[in-house]
């Protein structure tokens, strides 16, 4: 998961609001996942979610749609209304040869999603 407009937010509003967007993104992602799923900030404006016990692609798509919706509402911070969005790349562990390969597949899908449309997800296949 990678922000679509984080640099623009930092440039327009400053780093304190950018930091708040990162915190709010983490909170919203965690609130949009199940208790046994793992949400982590990898670096900068990039996050990862490890979903356990997902057996159907349709369920995965439903989860991704919920994640997209979680940031539909803007962040209200002091006197600022900040719209933010992200793109999601999806990869399946059983289709990867290693954890690094899994992340590379998810990154590949995420960057494809970024080129197609902001606020979108792509499944690596």
What is each of the regions a protein language model found here?
Residues 1:
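Active-site flanking residues adjacent to catalytic metal/cofactor-binding acidic residues
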Residues 4-34, 40-44, 48-49, 55-65, ...:
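Conserved long alpha-helical elements within nucleotide-processing catalytic cores of c-di-GMP signaling
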Residues 13, 82, 89-91, 118-121:
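Flexible, nucleotide-binding loop/lid elements of kinase catalytic cores
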Residues 41-42, 71-86, 114:
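Catalytic core regions of nucleotide second-messenger enzymes
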Residues 50-60, 78-81, 86-102:
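Catalytic strand-loop-helix junctions within cyclic-nucleotide turnover domains
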Residues 68:
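Short alpha-helical N-box/ATP-lid segment at the N-terminus of the HATPase_c
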Residues 72, 104-124:
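Catalytic/regulatory signature loops of cyclic-dinucleotide turnover enzymes
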